[in-house]
């Protein structure tokens, strides 16, 4: 895709299997993205440079996935005015609770929108990015509306199936 609007950054390549769900969702909606592995702790200069130059490169939203001491979203948010969506990656001794707290507990003035730990996180991060982009793109907004209608139909079908038993 030529029109890259979303930057997806993960703290480690071990996050890639989870992050692929965000990519699949963006692909479904035809939203262009780029992916990078950048560590907030091991390559902080790269993280800051990536974030500082994101807007001039045409990005509109950044998604940051990290586990453990998950400071990636905060570091990226500190260096840009673009919306940053954090995906806390489950794992380690605290099974993602540390990543959740590190992602969601940001100081005033440095917001990171945070989605769920686990498999819903990447999908919801991509959907939130699509909603943000949809505020300035009527076609994308309509496709998101259609997606929501499909979700309603699936629930109605499940209800009909269970209710008829």
What residue spans do the PLM features occupy?
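Glycine-rich phosphate/diphosphate-binding loop of Rossmann-like nucleotide-binding domains
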Residues: 4-42
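Short glycine/serine/threonine-rich phosphate/pyrophosphate-binding segments
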Residues: 15-20, 43-47, 66-75, 94-97, ...
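C-terminal binding/interaction regions
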Residues: 4, 10-17, 21, 97-165
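Short coil/turn connectors at secondary-structure junctions
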Residues: 2-5, 29-32, 57-60, 80-84, ...
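Short, solvent-exposed amphipathic alpha-helical segments in soluble enzyme
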Residues: 21-28, 52, 79-81, 130-131
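Glycine-rich phosphate-binding loop
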Residues: 50-92
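Short beta->alpha connector loops at strand-helix junctions that form conserved
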Residues: 10, 37, 66, 87-90, ...
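N-terminal beta-loop-helix "entrance" segment that forms/cooperates
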Residues: 35-56
